[in-house]
């Protein structure tokens, strides 16, 4: 029988529900259990694929092409289990299905309502695709009390009644704010959060309390008394310097064992060797390397969450701290770039869409190429690298991308040439996008092949434009190596400048497949080149 665990949050958003769910999943895995983690988001968008990063942060792409919440990235990185389209749902997707079914007459003429019709769809999502797992952990987005989240809370309340405590556990994450003038953690917000949760029929079984400092036994006992939860099931969640310290912190607080005890499951020893190795490597990371990220959303780090984590994974691999320098691409010019990129050991241009800030990114790519600084271009970053090379090395001064330039030499073109711009709407945008995992063939003896130690790989994609193959010969005459292609050889996947220290651009998103215990080979090689550059300078 599958055991269901629901992770909810209160007091404030962004408390770390995703990290809590991912950490618990990993800890249960370490005891030999098979775990699946899912995210239920209450917003009305069908998925985050067309949402502004300022609204949502990174769009995380799964192997099967689902555009999902960045929390699924945490789930994958912590557990090593690939997520899929069945691991994420939104209110928008639920209502889309409901209204389609209503128009098809599937409700047989009854009045369609939130209860039971919306809640039934939510319950079906939670209770389906359970084969081969022991635990399903469901993170409910938002906080208790949010009006848009009520159908989700009602659905999990019903599941709780249906499955009883033998197979259903509620974990509630709250904040204990520290008031410096009073020199104490305040419990009142947690009381109100638990009260609000109980008001909709859910009594938390485990209360996880986020705080910036240690929670005393007296404070835990007080929380237990006022929230009517046994003190044993009040779990501290103290701020950590690095997110990869969180799972072991939860293990040390006994969260995994408390879950097993609640379900009356025999407590087994945990195999946490690889996580202790990560912690030791983090402790031993005394040297640092400075990486500049040339970004459009330089103030919103969550827009590049997986890139940041993938860089950290490579840092863990080499026992180096990654010192990220965020550069606003919009303000980068030929005049200030020397000052902006002073003492930088590597330059990374991440993926993105749209014309804004592209000029600064191209200037940064030229700076990396002409100064032989390790460079890594991802997706749009690779496309801009080919434009920079065309303009400044080959001499095609009017080189452009078809994404936002009609006039000029189109170095970057649409994948689907039959799709007119007027047809690219929210309704059919996915039809024009190359999404999910695709195979890629590498050329032997190249930087990419040596990094992967294989000639056949699979990587995740999210793009609708590609390199124009008509220019392959002229690029090759100027020293550019095309080292990776799609299976049909229609799409250039990787470019290299082998005469430089390390200059690589990829059409895919390698950051989505990097793990703290298995850093991605391209990020490993990029950081290796940056470390060597640092030592030489």
From Swiss-Prot:
ATP binds at residues 14-19, 71. One of its GO terms (cellular component) is cytoplasm. Keywords: ATP-binding, Glutamine amidotransferase, Ligase, Magnesium, Metal-binding, Nucleotide-binding, Pyrimidine biosynthesis. The keyword Metal-binding applies. GO terms for biological process: 'de novo' CTP biosynthetic process; pyrimidine nucleobase biosynthetic process. It is an enzyme of class 6 (ligase). Residues 1-265 are annotated as: Amidoligase domain. Residues 290-536 form the Glutamine amidotransferase type-1 domain. The keyword Oxidoreductase does not apply. Pathway: Pyrimidine metabolism; CTP biosynthesis via de novo pathway; CTP from UDP: step 2/2. Allosterically activated by GTP, when glutamine is the substrate; GTP has no effect on the reaction when ammonia is the substrate. The allosteric effector GTP functions by stabilizing the protein conformation that binds the tetrahedral intermediate(s) formed during glutamine hydrolysis. Inhibited by the product CTP, via allosteric rather than competitive inhibition. Disulfide bonds: none annotated. InterPro entries: Class_I_gatase-like (IPR029062), CTP_synthase (IPR004468), CTP_synthase_N (IPR017456), GATASE (IPR017926), GATase1_CTP_Synthase (IPR033828), P-loop_NTPase (IPR027417). L-glutamine binds at residues 352, 380-383, 403, 464. Catalyzes the ATP-dependent amination of UTP to CTP with either L-glutamine or ammonia as the source of nitrogen. Regulates intracellular CTP levels through interactions with the four ribonucleotide triphosphates. CTPSs have evolved a hybrid strategy for distinguishing between UTP and CTP. The overlapping regions of the product feedback inhibitory and substrate sites recognize a common feature in both compounds, the triphosphate moiety. To differentiate isosteric substrate and product pyrimidine rings, an additional pocket far from the expected kinase/ligase catalytic site, specifically recognizes the cytosine and ribose portions of the product inhibitor. This is CTP synthase. The lineage of its organism: Bacteria, Pseudomonadati, Pseudomonadota, Alphaproteobacteria, Rickettsiales. The gene is pyrG.
């Amino acid at each position: 029988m599958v055991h269901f665990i629901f992770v909810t949050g209160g007091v404030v958003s962004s408390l770390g529900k995703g990290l809590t769910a991912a950490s618990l999943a990993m800890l249960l895995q370490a005891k030999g259990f098979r775990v699946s983690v899912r995210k239920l988001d209450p917003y009305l968008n069908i998925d985050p694929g067309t949402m502004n990063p300022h609204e949502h942060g990174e769009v995380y792409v799964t192997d099967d092409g689902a555009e999902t919440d960045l929390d699924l990235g945490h789930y994958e990185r912590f557990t090593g289990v690939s997520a899929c389209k069945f691991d994420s749902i939104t209110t928008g997707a639920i209502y889309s299905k409901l209204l389609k079914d209503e128009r098809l007459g599937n409700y047989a003429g009854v009045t369609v309502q939130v209860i039971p019709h919306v809640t039934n769809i939510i319950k079906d999502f939670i209770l389906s695709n359970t084969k081969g797992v022991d635990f399903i952990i469901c993170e409910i987005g938002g906080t208790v009390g949010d009006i848009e989240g009520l159908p989700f809370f009602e659905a999990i309340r019903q599941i709780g009644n249906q499955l009883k405590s033998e197979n259903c556990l509620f974990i509630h994450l709250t904040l204990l704010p520290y008031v410096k003038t009073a020199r104490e953690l305040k419990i009142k917000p947690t009381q109100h959060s638990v009260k609000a949760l109980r008001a909709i029929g859910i009594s938390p079984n485990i209360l996880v309390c986020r705080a910036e400092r240690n929670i005393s036994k007296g404070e835990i006992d007080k929380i237990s008394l006022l929230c009517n939860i046994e003190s044993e099931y009040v779990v501290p969640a103290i701020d950590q310097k690095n997110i990869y310290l969180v799972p072991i912190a939860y293990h040390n607080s006994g969260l995994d064992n408390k879950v097993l005890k609640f379900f009356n499951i025999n407590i087994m020893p945990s195999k946490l060797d690889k996580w202790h190795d990560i912690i030791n490597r983090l402790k031993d990371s005394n040297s640092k390397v400075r990486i500049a990220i040339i970004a459009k959303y330089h103030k919103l780090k969550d827009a590049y969450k997986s890139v940041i984590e993938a860089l950290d994974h490579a840092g863990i691999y080499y026992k180096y701290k990654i010192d990220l320098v965020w550069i606003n691409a919009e303000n980068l010019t030929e005049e200030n770039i020397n000052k902006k990129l002073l003492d930088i050991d590597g330059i990374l241009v991440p993926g993105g869409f749209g014309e804004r800030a592209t000029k600064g990114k191209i200037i940064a790519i030229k700076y990396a190429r002409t100064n032989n600084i390790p460079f890594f271009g991802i997706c749009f970053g690779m496309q801009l690298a080919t434009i920079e090379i065309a303009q400044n090395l080959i001499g095609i001064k009017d080189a452009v991308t078809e994404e936002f330039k009609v006039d000029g030499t189109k170095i970057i073109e649409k994948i689907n040439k039959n799709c007119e711009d007027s047809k690219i709407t929210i309704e059919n945008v996915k039809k024009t996008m190359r999404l999910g995992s695709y195979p890629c063939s590498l050329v032997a003896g190249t930087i990419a092949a040596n990094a992967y130690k294989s000639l056949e790989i699979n990587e995740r994609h999210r793009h609708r434009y590609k390199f124009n193959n008509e220019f392959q010969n002229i690029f090759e005459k100027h020293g550019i190596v095309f080292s990776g292609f799609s299976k049909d050889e229609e799409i250039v996947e990787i470019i290299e400048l082998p005469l430089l220290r390390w200059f690589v651009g990829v059409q895919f998103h390698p950051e989505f497949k990097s793990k703290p215990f298995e850093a991605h080979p391209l990020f490993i090689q990029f950081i290796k080149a940056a470390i060597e550059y640092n030592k030489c300078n």
